[in-house]
């Protein structure tokens, strides 16, 4: 059996340094006035989605999970600082790290993607408990049938989750790949695993991409796409 491996590099690799301009905390903002358009903070998101008064319920039963598929790790000190500045001076938010398939974690080497994901998830869902999965492997590892093979991060992550007695009700990941780059068989297997999570009452959110929905080319070089 021949294994084919593709290494996907996230678009945030060369991201610019965030603006250092101070922003008012969420609790001090006038919710009828839109926040600065050149910054995306928790205030920006709560204004756009009109969720100023939202308070997470049943936080002793619910949980929010975030997947990390590359060595881009969050940092507790950074999270505490972010929450104090942008989430009504809350400073006790934490997250649990779970390693899957040999995934690593180095709190002394935080990266943009890891910090961004855990910080915004925590700010918008606090005090709901947060779990960070660090998944080892590579993106798009498939055999000569086109199906995902051991070592594929999505396959390893799905199989791990489905083997747990309890799974967070909401899961978010900002990693993905273009549909045209996936064999049909690969996509079908992963779709069935998604369905199994859905059958257990789990909602899985995926980012639309750094440039928004429809920014990529859905047609491959060898034929039309995407898969229907």
Regions found by a protein language model. Give the residues of each.
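Substrate-binding/charge-relay-adjacent region of secreted/lumenal peptidase catalytic domains
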Residues: 1-228
């Amino acid at each position: 059996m021949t294994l084919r491996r593709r290494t996907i590099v996230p678009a945030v690799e060369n991201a610019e340094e965030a603006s250092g301009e101070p922003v008012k905390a969420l609790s001090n903002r006038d919710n009828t006035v839109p926040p600065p358009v050149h910054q995306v903070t928790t205030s920006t998101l709560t204004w756009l989605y009109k969720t100023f008064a939202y308070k997470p319920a049943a936080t002793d039963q619910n949980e929010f999970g975030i997947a990390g598929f590359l060595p881009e790790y969050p940092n507790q000190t950074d999270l505490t600082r972010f929450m104090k500045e942008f989430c009504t001076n809350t400073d006790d938010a934490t997250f649990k790290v779970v390693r899957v398939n040999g995934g690593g974690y180095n709190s002394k080497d935080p990266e943009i993607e890891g910090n961004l994901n855990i910080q915004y998830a925590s700010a918008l869902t606090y005090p709901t408990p947060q779990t960070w999965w660090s998944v080892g492997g590579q993106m798009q590892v498939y055999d000569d049938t086109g199906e995902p093979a051991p070592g594929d991060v999505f396959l390893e992550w799905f199989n791990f989750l489905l083997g747990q007695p309890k799974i967070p009700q909401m899961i978010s990941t900002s990693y993905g790949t273009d549909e045209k780059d996936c064999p049909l068989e690969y996509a079908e297997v992963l779709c069935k695993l998604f369905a199994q999570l859905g059958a257990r009452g789990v909602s899985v959110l995926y980012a639309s991409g750094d440039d928004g929905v429809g920014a990529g080319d859905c047609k491959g070089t060898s034929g039309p796409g995407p898969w229907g």
